[in-house]
Amino acid sequence: MEIQAAFFLNPMFFRFCASHCTVKFLHKLLNHHGLVLPVPLRNNETEIGEIAMEQMELKKLQILSAKIRIDILEMLVHCGQGHLGGAMSLVETMAVLYGKQLHVDPKNPQLEDRDMVVLSKGHAGPVWYATLAECGYFPKEWLFTLNQGGTKLPSHPDRTKTPGVDMTTGSLGQGTSSAAGIATGQRMKGSKRYTYLMVGDGELNEGQCWEAFQYIAANRLNNCIVIIDDNKRQLDGYTKDVLNPFSIPDKMKAFGFHTEVVKGQDIEAIDAAIDRAKAVKDQAVCIVLDSIKGAGVKYFEDMVSNHSVKFNNDEVIGEEKKAVENLQAWIEKEEPSCLS
């Protein structure tokens, strides 16, 4: 008989283990049921109770990621086409930012002293819209107006139209300079907030990116956290074939950035990398996401041209429907364990 995850996430279970179980035994038990217990640990109630909360938080971010993926798929199939691949590769990063890391207020999107987000790869707007809707910035019904006349959700982000969008982007490269300016302004005001700049690997074809990076590094803007979505593909092919970027991490290090690489679909790794980035002083910081374009749905991951997908035949629509059903079934199974 399957044991529900809620049983393992219950603090009472961990209190029992603190008194009656070894940490080694607890590792084996949780791993058997698909949960992870970090090491090393002391075998005491306080620390094991903290792990219960960490597992709960991780599960909530995983569920948020699944909901964002569903929203992206459903809004694009309703629209008939859209930028799927690069939106899906950023799902986990957006979930970590808005689900945990950002100092923002959905009820007050223009909060004066808030963290700022710049999605320089503006064609990935659907992942931003889905995240904002899930976090309560606007009604989810708006998602089905994507790129339609009179919409508040244009194909590329527009700060004058969408609550929660801090900068208009879409012309590749320009968001990097905008983020550099915003971070400079934050520093001049003495703000302790951060600017999160998300850039695509294909976008690095634009020279403006490197001009902005040089400025960010030279001015040691450690409050501007650069996140590069290295999903290996762009509009017209693989990045290595269009204009080989060689080693993006080496380039960023050479520019003066404290740089690390994490798996782009690993929530815990992304979250930990952002924590480490915030701890860096007197140096610009960059996180390179080793990500998968179209991530989360094998059919779309394997699609050769998944930058922009047309939902205009039975096969593609059928795969979208199957993916949504699978994600919804997983949420229905896992979400009860996270309800307080």
Regions found by a protein language model. Name each.
Residues 29-52:
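Short, Lys/Arg-enriched N-terminal segments with co-localized hydrophobic residues
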